[in-house]
């Protein structure tokens, strides 16, 4: 039996009862020359990575088992279970992206298939095919990404209630900046779950203390008088299906177009989904020379490694003496809400609204943060199962940095939740996080992260 899938992120599973002199299981099948999956004779599981590459594992379940394949954009997790509750992964992150007509000819799809081999018979039951993109009802935890000034790396923390966050890996980096960035350090990490269920993480390629750490001989990458504080020319893009294994691309603006050879900064990149264009939209702070910062946007491909359009102006602050930076765009209902930082009279957070992701945006004159000192890096996130939104921002205007939080249900009235460890929001094992972002994740995703980053006591 073959089934043609209609989703990029789906789960297919079936209960298999293997008879005598029989080997049966579940495959993703393109042709006789291209397939992947798992079969069993009741004694061993044989996992096919492709037609010519396979391995075996002991079958401790027996002749009756449930086989499951989770296809996440041609990235497979193949598992088996006795009861459909506890699953044993046999292989994870199996790439089947080359199982298509360009490689194997024909114009077929990679389809779920039930397979039975040998003289004996098999019984298949309870076949399942379903879209695997989690909805809010499936969420059970929160994931925060941020950077710390001492490490210039990606850090992660998890909360199960949206109030108390515990850093993974004992607050050490989960992705070291010097392994992914041209400047050997990153800032401003942002994470976004796309409509395909994948995770898209972007960050500034910039080490503010690169000279001190021995990564360069000058204070900045280029002349500060000509290009300004913290000058850089690129960003880092990373994509993952499981929050552990990440693809990685250094996007350098001068390589995108010669028009950006003199770009002075590319800061705080974030990603959203443009529902009208049906594309991932990357937006960021940028300026040339010593001009004021403006917000720009461009569309990025699904692989998250190439711009599909040149950057265009998203927002220029109307006061010619002030700039707009650090945008955070979230679609709520029919409106795109853009929180951003400006320095018009004070340095804090304002809001602009639009019917479209790429604008135009209508500004208002209200300040939203409650910080008595300068803040930046706004990030908006929703409490699971509640009509409550939390605006988090980076309070950098004091010696010891911290995150501030305000909460709203209508974006008119806001409740001040204070800062980490100075109110209801708690940071268990870390301090002084910088420019972060929070998303909802499932219990399975949270537990996978905790298991992967657990440290020995």
Model-found features: residue ranges?
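Extracellular glycan-recognition regions
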Residues: 1-138, 438, 455-456
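Surface loop/turn signatures of beta-propeller and other carbohydrate-active proteins
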Residues: 55-60, 89-111, 133-139, 146-147, ...
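Conserved Ser/Thr-centered positions that define the repeating blades of beta-propeller domains
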Residues: 78-83, 159, 240, 298-301, ...
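Entry beta-strands of beta-propeller and related beta-repeat scaffolds
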Residues: 138-143, 197-201, 277-282, 335-337, ...
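Residue-level signature of beta-propeller blades and closely related beta-rich strand-turn architectures
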Residues: 148, 205-207, 286-288, 342-344, ...
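Structural motif
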Residues: 151-157, 210-216, 230-236, 291-297, ...
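Active-site neighborhood of glycoside hydrolase catalytic domains
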Residues: 274, 297, 336, 340, ...
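Loop/turn-rich, solvent-exposed surfaces of beta-rich toroidal or solenoidal domains
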Residues: 344-351, 355-361, 368-404
């Amino acid at each position: 039996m073959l089934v043609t899938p209609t989703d990029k992120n789906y789960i297919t599973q079936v209960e298999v009862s293997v008879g005598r002199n029989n080997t049966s299981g579940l495959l993703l099948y393109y042709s006789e020359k291209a397939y992947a999956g798992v079969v069993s004779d009741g004694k061993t599981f044989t996992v096919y990575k492709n037609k010519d590459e396979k391995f075996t594992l002991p079958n401790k379940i027996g002749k009756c088992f449930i086989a499951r394949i989770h296809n996440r954009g041609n990235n497979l997790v193949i598992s088996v279970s006795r009861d459909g509750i506890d699953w044993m992964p046999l292989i994870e992150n199996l790439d089947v992206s080359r199982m298509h007509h360009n490689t194997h000819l024909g114009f077929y799809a990679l389809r779920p298939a039930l397979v039975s081999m040998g003289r004996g018979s098999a019984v298949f039951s309870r076949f399942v095919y379903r879209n695997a993109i989690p909805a809010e009802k499936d969420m059970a935890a929160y994931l925060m990404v941020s950077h710390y000034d001492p490490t210039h790396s990606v850090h992660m923390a998890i909360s199960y209630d949206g109030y108390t966050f515990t850093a993974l890996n004992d607050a050490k980096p989960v992705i070291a900046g010097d392994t992914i960035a041209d400047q050997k350090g990153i800032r401003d990490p942002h994470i976004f779950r796309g409509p395909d269920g994948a995770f898209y993480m972007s960050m500034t390629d910039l080490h503010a203390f690169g000279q001190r750490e021995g990564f360069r001989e000058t204070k900045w990458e280029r002349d500060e008088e000509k290009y300004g504080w913290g000058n850089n020319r690129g960003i880092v893009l990373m994509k993952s299906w499981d929050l552990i294994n990440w693809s990685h691309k250094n996007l350098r603006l001068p390589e995108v177009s010669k028009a950006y050879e003199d770009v002075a900064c590319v800061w705080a990149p974030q990603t959203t989904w443009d529902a009208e264009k049906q594309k991932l939209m990357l937006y960021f702070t940028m300026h040339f020379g010593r001009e004021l910062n403006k917000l720009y946007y461009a569309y990025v491909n699904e692989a998250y490694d190439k711009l599909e359009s040149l950057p265009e102006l998203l927002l220029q602050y109307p006061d010619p003496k002030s700039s707009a930076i650090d945008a955070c765009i979230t679609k709520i209902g029919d409106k795109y809400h853009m929180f951003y930082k400006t320095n018009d009279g004070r340095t804090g957070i304002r809001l602009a609204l639009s019917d479209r992701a790429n604008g135009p945006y209508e500004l208002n004159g209200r300040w939203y943060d409650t910080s008595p000192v300068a803040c930046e890096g706004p990030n908006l996130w929703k409490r699971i199962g509640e009509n409550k939104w939390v605006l988090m921002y980076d309070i950098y205007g004091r010696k010891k940095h911290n995150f501030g939080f305000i909460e709203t249900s209508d974006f008119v009235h806001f409740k001040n939740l204070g800062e980490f460890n100075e109110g209801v929001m708690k940071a268990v094992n870390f301090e002084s996080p910088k420019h972060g972002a929070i998303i909802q994740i499932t219990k399975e995703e949270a537990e996978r992260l905790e298991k992967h980053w657990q440290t020995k006591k």
